[in-house]
Amino acid sequence: MITKSFLIAMSTLLLTACPDSNRTHAQQKPAAPVTVKPAPAKPAPKDASAKPADKDAAIITSIIKDSEAYYKELCKDASVSKEERRSKLILHIARKFLGTPYVAKTLETKGKERLVINARQLDCTTYVENTMAIYLCVSNGQTSYDNYKNQLRLLRYANGEVAYAARQHYFTQWIEENTKKGYVHELQSPTPPFTAEQLLRIDFMTTHVSLYPMLKDSPDDIKTIAQRERELSGRRYRYIPKTSIRNNSLFRSTIKDGDIIAITTSKKGLDTSHIGIAVWHKDGLHMLNASQIHKKVVEEPMTLYQYMQRHPSQTGIRIVRMK
């Protein structure tokens, strides 16, 4: 006869054999494969034997399907403007990645450059790229996984060419190339709140080659990137000083939910040091971003103004809008 005490003992044994499988957010070690749960969409399958590429495909496909359904409902509402649909869809997609571990340099691979798709681990740039690639797919009705891969390639590389030197390492180049492709435009105005001007002096990569393993042993790539740095240097861009960021009608009418925030920097040789996605709360402008501080994708609890005051080298923000 199976007694009650026997059943309790077996239950305890099974629980002991199944430890908690929650994701880790440690930055120093490679993050374990995880599954983003984009509620209310069905979560990606938790198959421990699945390859990372299969998990990435499952995550992206799940987010695309959920976002496609969300967008169709938005389009049925005649009271929602085209601009509001864009903002709402971008935020909807961006929030699907909340909690995803922050891992730097996931695009750096051994050997030849390839199109890296990693939805399990994100840095600030890959977070924005993945969000915007999915946005472009859904808003244009091209929602297959192959459509997504193609869109990501076009966003990430100059002329869509998968090569290390063609990857848009400087965000100013990313803006420029994707403006040419018709995906984005940068807000540039001589009037407030764009009251400051950034003069570019770009040379960080070629003066810090040792920081880039895929670059240091490639003289041709160094030469190509040095040429691109020279082309970017000397350009001037309007930006909003961090001390000027406010929660008022001017800022709310200028910066929209879903805009890309590019944080300008005083660090020598760089144009920007961090990027994220704008989101307004009652207390002011906040930022969705893959955070090195929080070690995951977060909707920053501090306002952007408060956040930037804690980073002395951050000077202000440039604003880029998806089309």
Q: Residue ranges of each PLM-predicted region?
A:
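C-terminal soluble interaction/assembly domains
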Residues: S253-K323
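Sec-dependent N-terminal signal peptides
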Residues: S5-L13
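Acidic/His-rich structured neighborhood in mature extracellular/periplasmic domains
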Residues: T100-R238, W280, N289-Q292
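Cationic-aromatic interfacial patches
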Residues: K51-T131
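N-terminal secretory signal peptides that target proteins for export/translocation
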Residues: M1-I2
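C-terminal motif of bacterial Sec signal peptides marking the signal peptidase cleavage site
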Residues: T16-A17
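Short alpha-helix capping/helix-loop boundary micro-motifs
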Residues: Y239-F251, T265
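Compositionally biased, proline/threonine/alanine/serine-rich low-complexity intrinsically disordered stretches
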Residues: R23-D56
